[in-house]
């Protein structure tokens, strides 16, 4: 404004995802410079935004994602940062590239978009700026929330449940595992059909209608329900077959041992080390979904059956709960459980609690258990220890201050440091390095052949 109060120029600003500040302020223009109208400027800005959208489409091949976590201000249990780290690991398993993360603490979620509108817009601008094409929320979104956020963001939005379903679908190998995952996916989809709109064509393409007045949505719901029914029938048949196999093993009177633990605790690596087998043991969450069974032979021609199982996880999605528990049903016939714990994980105590909670829900907490604290080679304190081999070639560890023996004092000290009862049925191992396996096998043999059922069977034979 000049001294007379008349305009002598103007400034303009607009959102700009390509700028570090997410906006741009244009230079001041004077009345004599107004050769273009405001409309032309707006069209130029929209053209630049369109180019950003093109870059976004090019990025879709990389599965670039932005993670969003909304947690109560005073959360009980796991710290939000640990929950977000687990979500990152889930993304890595699903081959999703995490570009950035966002954590907000608030006690009341926005019923329509979870986050407040302003915060959501900030995230969307940042996502466009970094060429992100996927938002992953660390909670289960309602169908209306997912649709609302996707409409506002104009990019794909999924929640933790969908991510886990995708991982299960990738990793299931057996017929039973694949059917369980498909059933879980369909049950998840069924409750969200009313929100799918344009996506319905993918579900109903090529399917004939029930009648001239039936909509695509009605066709979709009916077909999903029919498929769910068929899957449940087939899964019941497979369950009967598994029961027959378990009865056969019982008749052979071979002791059964089940390995349980949080996902990525190293269960498959542990079983591989014990049995010299080659079960897939990637450093990813849910690398194992289908139960795997092997045999271990002890002296005096004594054998046991030992089985690996799917890893446990916090807050398992309801749609996967039945599928997950079905894969664990064989644990009910176990004479002994082996709980493998990743002791190097800062969240390991809460992970142990999650496993124990699920075992209680499955009514398996009465089964005797050995705890295996795995990955001790990742502990900073352990890196100063020596590695030795006994006369049979088994690797053991000792503290530098101990010149002879397997380092029992140092192990006892470390157990005490970790809050483990020195006299409890707990062993420290590194399955990856092969350390501590002899101590585990000795304890396993002692426990398994002192079980009441086995003593009774031996007495009967005598």
Curated annotation (Swiss-Prot):
InterPro entries noted in UniProt: G_HFLX_dom, GTP-bd, GTP-bd_M, GTPase_HflX, GTPase_HflX_N, GTPase_HflX_N_sf, P-loop_NTPase, Small_GTP-bd
Record's subcellular location: Cytoplasm
CDD domains, per database record: HflX (cd01878)
Sequence ranges assigned to domain Hflx-type G in this UniProt record: 255-452
GO MF annotation terms: GTP binding; GTPase activity; metal ion binding; ribosome binding
Sequence positions that bind Mg(2+): 268, 288
Binding of GTP, residues: 261-268, 286-290, 308-311, 374-377, 430-432
Keyword Cytoplasm attributed: yes
One cellular component term from this protein's GO annotations in UniProt: cytoplasm
Keywords: Cytoplasm, GTP-binding, Magnesium, Metal-binding, Nucleotide-binding
Domain of life: Bacteria
Pfam families: GTP-bdg_M, GTP-bdg_N, MMR_HSR1
Cofactors demanded by this protein: Mg(2+)
Family: Belongs to the TRAFAC class OBG-HflX-like GTPase superfamily. HflX GTPase family.
Role description: GTPase that associates with the 50S ribosomal subunit and may have a role during protein synthesis or ribosome biogenesis.
Quaternary structure note: Monomer. Associates with the 50S ribosomal subunit.
Official protein name in the record: GTPase HflX
Lineage: Bacteria, Pseudomonadati, Spirochaetota, Spirochaetia, Leptospirales
């Amino acid at each position: 404004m000049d001294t007379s109060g008349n305009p002598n120029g103007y400034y303009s600003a607009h959102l700009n995802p390509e700028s570090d500040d997410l906006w741009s302020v244009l230079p001041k223009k004077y009345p004599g410079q107004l050769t273009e109208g405001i409309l032309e400027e707006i069209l130029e800005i929209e053209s630049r935004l369109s180019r950003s959208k093109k870059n976004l489409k090019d990025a879709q091949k990389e599965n670039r994602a932005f993670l969003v976590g909304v947690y109560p201000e005073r959360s009980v249990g796991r710290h939000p940062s640990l929950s977000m780290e687990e979500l990152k690991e889930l993304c890595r398993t699903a081959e999703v590239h995490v570009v950035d993360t966002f954590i907000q603490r608030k006690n009341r979620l926005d019923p329509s978009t979870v986050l407040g509108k302003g915060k959501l817009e900030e995230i969307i601008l940042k996502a466009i700026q970094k060429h992100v094409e996927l938002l992953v929320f660390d909670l289960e979104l309602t169908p209306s929330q997912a649709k609302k956020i996707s409409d506002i963001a104009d990019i794909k939005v999924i929640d933790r449940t969908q991510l886990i379903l995708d991982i299960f679908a990738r990793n299931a190998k057996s017929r039973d595992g694949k059917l369980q995952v498909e059933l879980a996916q369909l049950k998840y989809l069924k409750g969200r059909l009313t929100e799918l709109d344009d996506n319905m064509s993918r579900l109903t393409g090529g399917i004939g209608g029930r009648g001239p007045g039936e909509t695509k949505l009605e066709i979709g719901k009916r077909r999903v329900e029919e498929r769910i029914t068929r899957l449940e029938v087939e899964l019941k048949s497979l369950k009967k077959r598994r029961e027959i196999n378990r009865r056969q093993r019982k008749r052979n009177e071979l002791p059964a041992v089940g390995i349980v633990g949080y996902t990525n605790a190293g269960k498959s690596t542990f079983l591989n080390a014990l049995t010299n087998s080659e079960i897939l043991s990637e450093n990813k969450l849910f690398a194992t979904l289908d139960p795997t069974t092997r045999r271990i032979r002890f002296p005096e021609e004594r054998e046991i059956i030992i089985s690996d199982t799917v890893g446990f996880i916090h807050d398992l999605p309801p749609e996967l709960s039945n599928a997950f528990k079905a894969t664990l049903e064989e644990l009910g016939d176990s004479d002994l459980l082996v709980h493998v714990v990743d002791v190097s994980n800062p969240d390991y105590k809460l992970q142990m609690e999650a496993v124990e909670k699920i075992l209680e829900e499955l009514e398996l907490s009465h089964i005797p258990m050995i705890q295996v604290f795995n990955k001790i080679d990742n502990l900073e304190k352990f890196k100063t220890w020596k590695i030795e081999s006994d006369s049979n070639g088994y690797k053991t560890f000792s503290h530098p201050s101990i010149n002879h023996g397997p380092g029992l004092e140092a192990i006892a000290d470390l157990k005490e440091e970790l809050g483990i009862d020195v006299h409890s049925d707990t062993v420290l191992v590194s399955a990856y390095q092969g350390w501590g396996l002899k101590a585990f096998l000795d304890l396993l043999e002692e426990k398994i052949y002192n079980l009441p059922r086995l003593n009774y069977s031996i007495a009967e034979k005598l």
